[in-house]
Regions:
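C-terminal motif of bacterial Sec signal peptides marking the signal peptidase cleavage site
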Residues: 17-20
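Bacterial N-terminal signal peptides that target proteins for export
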Residues: 1-9
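Short, highly charge-biased, low-complexity peptide segments
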Residues: 124-130
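N-terminal pre-ligand scaffold of iron-sulfur
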Residues: 24-102, 117-118, 133-148
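Short metal-binding segments enriched for Cys and/or His
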Residues: 115-123
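Alpha-helical transmembrane segments
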Residues: 11-15
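Short cysteine-rich clusters marking metal-coordination/redox-active sites
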Residues: 87, 107-109
């Protein structure tokens, strides 16, 4: 009896590992328009150029980072977002860099009216379109770290 229980136990254990692995079926997370650039940024909130990030509702744009820049937004001093400024529904081109009037990022390409919330990166009117590409962001004291 002991010898039949051991293989059964291992089979159950292996099956539970296999079925517990999640699969992300949302095709919007596999955006063919944007690459994953290497991002590793530290922001010191004591520096004047990042002072706005000490207050909820404010944002700072990091030019020269990511693909077309990164917008960092203070949601509530505990939650920050860092999002790519290249419109996720266009391959990067001359007009794909979005402009920001918090809390909205707008694509200036004349062919559409893509607008996104910088609070969560979602398209303002069409949730079937790709959302803005997020970066990991962590605040520790007066330091904000942005990575991917």
């Amino acid at each position: 009896m002991k010898s039949t229980m051991k293989p059964f136990f291992y089979s159950i254990l292996i099956a539970s590992f296999l079925f517990s692995c999640g699969k992300d079926d949302d095709p919007r997370n596999n955006n063919p328009n944007l690459t994953d650039p290497i991002v590793n940024i530290s922001l010191n909130l004591n520096l004047p150029q990042y002072d706005a990030l000490k207050f909820p509702g404010n944002s700072v744009i990091l030019n020269g980072e990511g693909i077309r820049g990164i917008v960092v937004y203070n949601v509530n001093n505990d939650l920050y977002t860092a999002l790519e400024l290249s419109d996720p529904n266009h391959p990067p081109n001359d007009c794909s860099r979005m402009t920001v009037a918090a809390p909205i990022a707008t694509c200036p390409c004349g062919s559409d009216t893509n607008e996104y919330f910088i609070t969560d990166g979602q398209h303002r009117t069409d949730n079937t379109l790709y959302p803005m590409q997020p970066y990991r962001i962590v605040r520790t004291g007066d330091q904000i770290r942005i990575t991917n």
